[in-house]
Swiss-Prot record:
Subunit-level organization: Monomer.
Entry keyword annotation includes Cell division: no
Role played: Catalyzes the specific phosphorylation of the 3-hydroxyl group of shikimic acid using ATP as a cosubstrate.
Native organism: Aliivibrio fischeri (strain ATCC 700601 / ES114)
Enzyme class name: transferase
Residues annotated as binding substrate: 36, 60, 82, 139
Cofactor stoichiometry and binding remark: Binds 1 Mg(2+) ion per subunit.
GO biological process terms on file: amino acid biosynthetic process; aromatic amino acid family biosynthetic process; chorismate biosynthetic process
Catalytic reactions of this protein: shikimate + ATP = 3-phosphoshikimate + ADP + H(+)
Chain residues that bind ATP: 14-19, 120, 156
Entry protein name: Shikimate kinase
Major localization listed first in the record, in broad terms: cytoplasm
Gene this protein is translated from: aroK
Length: 172
């Protein structure tokens, strides 16, 4: 793992990127960063506000800049936003600057994990399942393209998934 010290987590909303990322960082004594949190810190507003005011395109532009900045750090675990892989530049930076782990999960698990979360602007709809299915259709191939590893998170605790990732990296 020496040549690629950073660990970047990609996957859909509700896959567990932030929770698993915190466990990974703690166990590996690395810094944990969340691109959505950094966007909120830099704008002084939450993601939903950025979406409302700047639209998805404005948000994606901000996200691309944050991904560029954060992937230049050393020794980090980065939880990316679910749509970060839409940008080819972001995919290239993630691939070049760290080990990319795709956290895969089912639509059912995504719904269960996100149903009470009001901070997900794309899910503020009467048909969240349809939105998640459309996003999966658009993004799953991009997650696979950019990833070095794929890990299912459906019925496992964040700690178990973090341990699986550590084991994969050690076997590398």
């Amino acid at each position: 793992m020496a040549e690629k010290r950073n660990i970047f987590l990609v996957g859909p909303m509700g896959a567990g990127k932030s929770t698993i990322g915190r466990h990974l960082a703690q166990q590996l004594h690395m810094e944990f960063l969340d691109s959505d949190t950094v966007i909120e810190e830099r704008t002084g507003a939450d993601i939903a506000w950025v979406f409302d005011v700047e639209g998805e395109e404005g948000f994606r532009k901000r996200e691309e800049g944050v991904i560029n900045d954060l992937t230049q750090e050393q020794g980090i675990v980065l939880a990316t936003g679910g749509g970060s892989v839409i940008s080819k530049e972001s995919r290239n930076r993630l691939s070049a600057r760290g080990v990319v782990v795709y956290l895969e999960t089912t639509i059912e698990k995504q719904l269960a994990r996100t149903q009470r979360d009001k901070k997900r602007p794309l899910l503020q709809t009467d048909e969240p399942r349809e939105v998640l299915e459309a996003l999966a259709k658009e993004r799953n191939a991009l997650y696979e393209e950019v990833s070095d590893y794929v890990v299912r998170t459906d019925d496992q605790s964040a700690k178990v998934v973090a341990n699986q990732i550590i084991q994969m990296l050690e076997e590398r």
